[in-house]
């Protein structure tokens, strides 16, 4: 049976939202994209071309795929422009209030397709609690960063009907991703592990270890170097996640600075 998803939408074009939209288009889906921030929309073409160039240098995308991608990656001036999508992925800030406002607006546009959220900390139950979303058409699909290079996607589908479950799972597999069913708990599997890892890395730094020592030790253990990873995280998102999870103290959180967002990284 062919998958009914042909056109997808993405709301929120930060680091992960942009890469998710890029992945959708790269895999042949018509991707309608929108962000409420004008700066995000204004920089969209430049970001797309920079990503294309990077993937071409690594031999991960052909010239024909590039031509198709440019046609399929379609900016929208508002949320109403996404209403025709068969599936919309919400990738806005880790804030339930903001997410619910997006869902309310989408409902007002007449959108009736499947809705997924890329949240890494807010539970599905929380987002369903106010009745804005149809639970039969709503799933949590948490991609991993960097989206274009990681395969696992955490999935929470709860009481969705079987046909919609199958549609979403097949869609993720078409993207070349491995859906992993996860319990609906704050932080899910990945962030539960990641936050413990992050706290311990910071504690080692406080105890006198050098950044390069911690990162090298992680590499020897076949783990992602923690401080190298921190420099790709957006501090505001980390703060939102840790507030929700209540697992990271403020003094540890203060170490999360990145070159992209603060003008300096851990090496500085």
Regions from the PLM with identified roles:
Residues 1-268:
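N-terminal glycine-rich phosphate-binding loop for ADP-containing cofactors
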């Amino acid at each position: 049976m062919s998958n009914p998803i042909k056109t997808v939408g993405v709301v929120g074009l930060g680091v992960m939202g942009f890469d998710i939209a890029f992945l959708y288009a790269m895999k042949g889906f018509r991707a309608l994209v929108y962000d409420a921030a004008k700066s995000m929309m204004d920089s969209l073409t430049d970001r797309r071309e920079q990503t294309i160039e990077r993937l071409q240098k690594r031999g991960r995308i052909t010239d024909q795929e590039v031509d198709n991608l440019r046609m399929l990656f379609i900016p929208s001036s508002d949320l109403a422009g996404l209403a025709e999508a068969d599936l919309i992925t919400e990738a806005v800030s880790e804030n339930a209030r903001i997410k619910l406002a997006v869902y309310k607006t989408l409902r007002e546009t007449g959108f009736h397709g499947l809705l997924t959220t890329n949240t890494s900390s807010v539970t599905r139950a929380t987002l369903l609690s106010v009745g804005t979303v149809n639970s039969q058409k709503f799933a949590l699909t948490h991609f991993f960063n960097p989206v274009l290079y990681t395969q696992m996607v955490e999935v929470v589908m709860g009481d969705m009907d079987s046909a919609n479950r199958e549609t979403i799972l097949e869609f993720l597999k078409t993207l070349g991703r491995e859906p992993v069913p996860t319990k609906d708990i704050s932080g899910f599997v990945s962030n539960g592990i990641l936050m413990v890892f992050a706290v311990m890395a910071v504690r080692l730094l406080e105890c006198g270890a050098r950044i390069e020592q911690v990162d090298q030790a992680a590499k020897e253990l076949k783990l992602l170097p923690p401080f190298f990873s921190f420099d790709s995280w957006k501090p505001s998102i980390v703060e939102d996640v840790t507030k929700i999870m209540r697992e990271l103290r403020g003094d540890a959180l203060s170490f999360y600075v990145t070159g992209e967002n603060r003008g300096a990284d851990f090496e500085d």
